[in-house]
Amino acid sequence: MAGVQRRILISRNEENLLNKGIGTKNVLGGKTTSTRTALSNISNIQRRPQLGGKVKKEDVGALEEKAPTNKSLGRMISQTNLLNEVQMKKNIQNLEDMAEVDLPINSMIDSFTDLEVDDIDLEDLGNPTLCAEYVKDIYKYMNKLEQRLVPGDYMPNQTEINFKMRSILVDWLIQVQSRFNLLQETLYLTIYILDRFLNKQNVKRAELQLVGVTAMLLASKYEEMYAPEIGDFVYITDNAYSKEKIRQMEQKMLKACEYDFSNPLCLHFLRRNSKAGAVDAQKHTLAKYLMELTLVEYEFITKLPSEVAAAALYLSMKLIDDSNWTPTLVHYSGYTEDAILPTVSKLSVLTLSMDNSKYQAVKNKYAASKFLRISRIPQLKGHVLNKFAERI
């Protein structure tokens, strides 16, 4: 419960530093390094000047209040009673409003008393960078937002492109992300922008790569501190598209996406789930590898990011040490074990197919030491993965 010591997982900044090959001492165990802040360690604490412990006589008089007269005292009591009556009416109205609110299905249980659920944010209270006081509200909002922004099955409406072309493009974009050393968030947002645009616009075969690099340009501007320039994308496409072409496509994609790139990402939900499960670096990295495999596969585009994140962590935990999907994980992920098993099975089939797949960018990427060579572990060819794959 609250008293249980919990391993605090890496923050977004530390995780990205680790992915870029920049070491952070003891990232996942014991003490963690401080997180990056834009304006150093600034707090709202105001330090008052000390007067050597002495208070001047004239200052004491300034703090004294005059005794109220009977007339003013009666007026104060009357005002207080009126305020209390108004506040009581507001409280009753708030309770009535709360009773009328329908909770979403995936919100599960909102209290910790019904199940053995740990409050994973308790230790973060008082740390302004972790937003522990309203982190639960943030994730409830993200759950609603992902349902509104998830792309539909758009490929049947496309006349010149198909599943294979999309997979080739995404596989190449993953290589570009590694080449430019971009954040993981940038990669996921790139694919979401790509799919959202294709969901609304028919694209010619000759312009598909243009749409892909423009999506990465937009995602870089949204996520990166120092985004690549348009000229970098002209170079990476071997001058297939001019700067002007990319600018024109950028305007077109901005309008199609309604200037809204606030997509909740799989990574956001995975970090929350990993904290709830108190998982180590190996399980967390394996879950990231499994999630990234789904980017290439068109079948997963209609899945909610939260569902993909939950399924990836569940499969990772089963592959490494057969860990249980605890009530705490059910509560914070929003998914029971039975709810995610169909997605886990599809993910298992996809993982087993990687040996014969033409799309090796993710597998090669996670074979590097900074990703713990996770794509080479023997569990990815073991009987546990086959058992889940056979459920389909």
From Swiss-Prot:
Pfam families in the record: Cyclin_C (PF02984), Cyclin_N (PF00134)
Keywords of the record: Cell cycle, Cell division, Cyclin, Mitosis
InterPro entries cross-referenced by the UniProt entry: Cyclin (IPR039361), Cyclin-like_dom (IPR013763), Cyclin-like_sf (IPR036915), Cyclin_A/B-like (IPR046965), Cyclin_C-dom (IPR004367), Cyclin_N (IPR006671), Cyclins_cyclin-box (IPR048258)
GO molecular function terms attached to this record: cyclin-dependent protein serine/threonine kinase regulator activity
SUPFAM superfamilies the record matches: Cyclin-like
GO terms classed as biological process: cell division; mitotic cell cycle phase transition
Residues that span the membrane, as ranges: none
Domain of life of the organism encoding this protein: Eukaryota
Protein family according to the UniProt entry: Belongs to the cyclin family. Cyclin AB subfamily.
Function: Essential for the control of the cell cycle at the G2/M (mitosis) transition. Interacts with the CDC2 protein kinase to form MPF. G2/M cyclins accumulate steadily during G2 and are abruptly destroyed at mitosis.
Protein name per its UniProtKB record: G2/mitotic-specific cyclin-B
Species assigned in the record: Hydra viridissima
